Regions:
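N-terminal leader segment of winged-helix/HTH proteins
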Residues: 1-32
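A structural signal for well-ordered alpha-helices, especially hydrophobic packing surfaces
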Residues: 16, 20-23, 104, 132, ...
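N-terminal helix-turn-helix DNA-binding core of bacterial DNA-binding proteins
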Residues: 21-63
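Charged, amphipathic alpha-helical coiled-coil/dimerization segments
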Residues: 73-130
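Residues in the recognition helix of alpha-helical DNA-binding motifs
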Residues: 70
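Short, flexible helix-adjacent loops and helix caps
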Residues: 24-31, 85, 116-119, 140
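Generic structural concept
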Residues: 9, 13-16, 42, 97, ...
């Protein structure tokens, strides 16, 4: 692979990883992996009135133990509520609380700002490359 092509592929791969990280709620200042799963659970619960742990597990592809631990923490934090089925106390459901809705809105706002920054970077990338090449030519 030629030098310029290789550099462009590296750049595209780098941008793809950064966008994927943004989509997953990854934040460079807080590398806590729970953010991604928390965001996904809150987003799923915002779409429905309530979901069972099995539905959350199926929708998000998380392990049963991870769903249990994560939802337990979100209940403790007041971001989701746990309720039991009226006719069968063994069946539980989770629903998003107003605090959870506010947290999700904040996460979505941050994600939107991050997307805007990334898109501005992507749109300006050709100008950045051109300027870097001109600077390299001056230094030679």
């Amino acid at each position: 692979m030629e030098g310029q092509d290789f550099e462009e592929i590296k750049t595209i791969a780098s941008l793809a990883m950064r966008l994927q990280n943004l989509c997953e709620g990854f934040d460079e200042t807080n590398k806590n992996a729970i953010i991604s799963a928390k965001f996904k659970v809150l987003l799923e619960l915002s779409k429905k009135d309530k979901l069972s742990p099995a539905e959350i597990k199926q929708n998000l592809g998380l392990a049963k133990s991870n769903v249990s631990n994560l939802c337990g923490r979100l209940v403790e934090d007041g971001e989701i509520a746990k309720s039991k089925e009226k006719f069968d106390n063994r069946t539980i459901f989770y629903s998003i609380t107003p605090l959870g809705e506010a947290e999700l809105a904040d996460m979505l706002d941050k994600m939107q700002k991050n997307f805007k920054t990334e898109l501005e970077y992507k749109n300006n990338f050709p100008k950045i490359v051109k300027s870097a090449r001109e600077l390299a030519d001056l230094v030679k």
